[in-house]
Structure formats: C-alpha cells, structure tokens
C-alpha cells in the first residue's frame, strides 16, 4: 500500500512539472507572436536589400540569380510575391535560353504550388 501511495505521489509531481513546462512553452510562443511585426519588418528589410541590387545594366544571368534569391526570400513569407519572381525568372530564363535557370524556376514553381496545396 505504501508503494502505491509513493507511486501516486511521484506521478502527480511529474504531471505537475509537465504542465508547468507546457505553460512555459506557451508563454515563450506568445512572446514570439507579440514580436511578429518586428520579424516581418526585418524580413522585409532583407528582401528590400536584395531588390536594391537589381540594375537595368545587369546581364540576364545576374538578374536570374537575383530573382532566384528573391524567390528564396519570399518562399516562406509571401506566396504571391514568390510566384511573381518564379514567373519573371521563368520568362527571362526562357528568353535567355538558360536551361539551368529554366529548370530551377520550374522546380521552384512546383515546390511553391505543392506546399500551398495547388497540386494535381
């Protein structure tokens, strides 16, 4: 009988610790959610720095590399913007006859559509 009481006491202590840990994780998550605007601003600033590298005098390959970086930056951030750079990159790669970037942007498009639920 003593063993059962000890086991119940230990079990209740472990459950209490588990609930405390779960609440601590939720509090930490709430802190991250509260700082959402800061994270969005930081991400947008990073994207703006990449966009600022675009110049009219760039070669097609240089422009394609930047479109690729913009896709990567937008991929988990904004679906529509990521798709814009996939389409721009695909069109430029096709007109420049660059098979590497044609394939690369096809893969990006498939990945983007599949992860957003637009697959068939």
Regions picked out by a protein language model, each given a short descriptive name:
Residues 1-3:
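N-terminal secretory signal peptides that target proteins for export/translocation
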Residues 5-8, 16-120:
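A "functional boundary" signal
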């Amino acid at each position: 009988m003593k063993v059962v009481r000890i086991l119940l006491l230990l079990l209740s202590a472990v459950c209490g610790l588990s609930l405390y840990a779960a609440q601590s994780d939720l509090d930490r998550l709430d802190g991250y959610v509260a700082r959402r605007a800061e994270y969005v601003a930081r991400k947008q600033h990073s994207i703006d720095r990449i966009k600022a590298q675009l110049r009219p005098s760039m070669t097609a390959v240089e422009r394609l590399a930047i479109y690729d970086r913009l896709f990567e930056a937008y991929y988990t951030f904004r679906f529509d913007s990521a798709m814009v750079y996939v389409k721009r990159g695909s069109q430029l790669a096709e007109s420049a006859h660059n098979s590497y970037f044609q394939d690369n942007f096809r893969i990006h498009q498939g990945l983007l559509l599949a992860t957003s639920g637009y697959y068939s």
